[in-house]
Amino acid sequence: FTGKLVGTIKTVLGTAAIGKMISDSVNAGGALQQSLGGIETLFKDIADKVKTYAAQAYKTAGLSANDYMESTTSFAASLLSSVSQDTDAAAQLANMAMVDMSDNANKMGASMQDIQNAYQGFAKQNYTMLDNLKLGYGGTQAEMQRLLKDAEKISGVKYDLGNLADMYSAIHVIQTELDITGTTAREATTTLTGSFASMKAAAQNVLGQMALGEDLQPS
């Protein structure tokens, strides 16, 4: 009797696990489909480039493709406007920003959500969350201006307040100077926490691809 009971429990648990996997896959697929539509609408002819960045985000930013695209679409319109609708330039800048956000979260110990909120705020010329980045600048317009000036001293490039591409580029310069750039990619291959985040994001990609009927190929 005990053996039968154990077998029944195993069967039930196995069925529940399969059911959860199917449910998770459907949910991930629906979210992924919506994100893909947003990327195609915003980036048009260069959308495939953004999708490639998204597919690699589990390694470069510790994010699933869907999380990467959702965050990118939240500031893409403002970014496109700041580069005169140059979709290729915007795609590259968006990828730089996404990796910078993840690098900051991993190096400085800040919440990824707090950092994403800050970047989305910059797209609306709201600088109150600049201090979320923990780069030594307060959450004011004057402090963002100071960051731009500091970045200019390092790179020799002039950055304009109010231009989103300039702000993201200046933050990248400061983070590179502070040896923050590249943290996520390094941790994905050298630390348990980084490896786990990368594997978790990759697993979410697989669930989404399964639901959309895509080929599951190694990246």
Predicted regions mapped to residue ranges:
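Small-residue helix-packing and pore-constriction motifs in hydrophobic alpha-helices
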Residues: G7-A61, T72-S82, L93-A105, D114-D160, ...
